[in-house]
Amino acid sequence: MPRGAQAMLEKQADSVWNQLYEICWNFYVKNVWDINTFKAIVDKIEKSDDKQLIRFLIWFNDARKRSNFNDKFQWMTSFLYGRRYPPLGDDLVVKEPWNDLQQLDSIIKYGNEPIDLVKMQPDFTTEERIVQNRRVNNCSLICSLTNAREENQIKSYSVHNVFNVILHFNGSNRLVSVLRDSNFPKCSKDGAALTLFSHNIEDMLIELAYFEIKNNRNYAYGGSNTATDTYLLTGWIPEILNLGDVSFSEIRKCYQFNAMLALGTDSVKGKEVTENHDFVVTSVNWKKEQFTILNPHGTENPTVYTWDDLIKEFKWLYVNWDPYSKYTQRVKLHDRYPDKFNAYPTWTQKPLMCIENKSNSIQNCHLYLERHLLDDSILESNLTIGEIPRSGFTAVSAEGNNSGFCNMQLRLNPHETRLIFYHSDKKCNLTFHLLSNSGLVSMSKCKSDILTAESSWNITNNQWTIGTSEYFKSPVFKLKSDGFDDTYLDFELVSQLPAKVNFQIFESDDYALQRPIFKNDTYSPQIFSKHGVRLLKGREYFIVCSIAHHITSPFIFTLRNPETKQSKFELSPYSLGFGGLRYNEVLRCKTRITISVSNFTRLFVLLFTSASKTNGRLTLRLYEKETEEILFEQIETRYDLSVKPFPIPNIELKPASYVLEIFYNADVVICNLGTSHRAIFESDL
């Protein structure tokens, strides 16, 4: 075939590849499916002799028919820095890149330093190993690449002038392509190279792909860690262990399965090794408890450390292990974590994951949580995973770090279900990887068994603590239950802003709030909880939520029933100061209030004073004005309305005029008056 004709066919094939890419992208990411466009591309491909193109078409046609949320989520999270990184492995060869590689070749940077972009050749002047360029802060990548090469875990292939490497991020294998003859940076000032040193040009291309993903092709990098970078290169599960918290036998147990090891130092000075630096573990002598360590700087020979010396010099052990050496099953579940989950510092407001063992045998599982990469890298942002307790609000376990991943080991009894909560300091996308040895172990999102009510403290209700006459003005909830037995509940009060908080529970006939069902007037920082509170059957309760300082803040009140036998509960706001009645009035009086009603109505009265101690004789009388029929009368020889409000609850009134007389040793008494229908009140002040 003439050379010109061959070039024309290749150009047409390239065009078909890109058209098929767009159809695929539109289907998964934009949720657009044009059957006519698809049929047209099928006709073109059927006339082609490109086996890879035909294979990709067959794969896509099958995949789209069985696609689910997870599949679409993996494609929707393929976008990074405005570029596409499809969830494809090395088993599905593509002939065209998904991004404009020529344009990418021009955006390489080294911070704000002036650089020249040049073609580079492998470095045959160094030893036959990968060596870090000290001007570039990527010791973790060099350690990871060294280990991955040794374990033959780099997945890559080349087509024409494109080098394709499979990296692992955003919950999937992902295709990253760079030009085989890519430009590389050199310092303009002294001509020094800014790439790693290796006999293999592909190591330099992998470094370029790494910086494309991690730092938008900027070689001025803040650094990472070997566990994270090894996962990026190989997909092997990462773990970071503090050497001070593990024993030599535990490390040996890690190594029983295919594993890659590296070490990291901290910022403590005065040690022999470089601070804040990662090192490769090239071998371990298990009998002598000796580790052979290699510095990625390449200026030192491998050094042998005993276990005792190792824990003195190094801080971190980075372990990456092959998931398929321990487990046969892998299930993934993707999720988004929005800011709203961080409104309150409690797991009760976090999303939950349910891990269930449906088999008849004990199952050992591993849960790995991965945070997705974003254009603006999330630095110093913690990711936390924990297990919800059977009762109460203290997590069974909760481990977190800022590495971008979390791990949890689970041992599930037959037919056991465990609930896991997860947290991120910042909004992000996440992927759960559940590893097990049974297809009967499943993972799903779920809802908690808690009941939550939300309210807020403001200038009208944040000034009265326990023991004050106006304590009832604090936010109040009324709790109802349809249970036929006594029950034990767990309660938690959480302020959104830092503040000292407390709640007390009273039976619903205790309008004066003098008999809490548990006595605890301590105010706790931001969270106040009580476990195993006994509530009697058939009773209703008031829950008063107060704050120690005059702070304006939203809060949540949470109820949890740990018992297997569930009852239904209703938690609703309640205006305790007015008996929960619709119409409210506050009057100041000396000795007399006149009440005029035109409909049958229910009356609630609450008397108190805001003055200092007023302990003395209190006489109350409510009577119909015309007939002088007494509806309520009570005398208290010693009563202090400045501490203990006095309630007159639920008096039924017919249409008429009434008089409420109050004899007390205070200049002014404040009266809260609640009615179910409108009424007219007149005070003698």
UniProtKB/Swiss-Prot annotation:
Q: Which SUPFAM superfamilies does the entry mention?
A: Cysteine proteinases
Q: Keywords in UniProt for this one? A: Hydrolase, Protease, Thiol protease
Catalytic-site annotation from UniProt: C139, H277, N295
Q: Which GO terms describe its molecular function?
A: cysteine-type endopeptidase activity
Name residues in a coiled coil: none
Hydrolase found in the keyword field: yes
Q: Which residues form the Calpain catalytic domain?
A: 82-323
Q: What is its EC number?
A: 3.4.22.-
First-tier enzyme category under EC:
hydrolase
Q: Which InterPro entries match?
A: PalB/RIM13_Calpain-like, Papain-like_cys_pep_sf
Q: List the disulfide bonds.
A: none
**BP-aspect Gene Ontology terms:** proteolysis
Query: Family assignment?
Result: Belongs to the peptidase C2 family. PalB/RIM13 subfamily.
What is this protein for, i.e. what is its function?
Answer: Required for the proteolytic cleavage of the transcription factor RIM101 in response to alkaline ambient pH.
Q: What is this protein called?
A: Calpain-like protease palB/RIM13
Task: From the UniProt record, report the name of the gene that encodes this protein.
Answer: RIM13
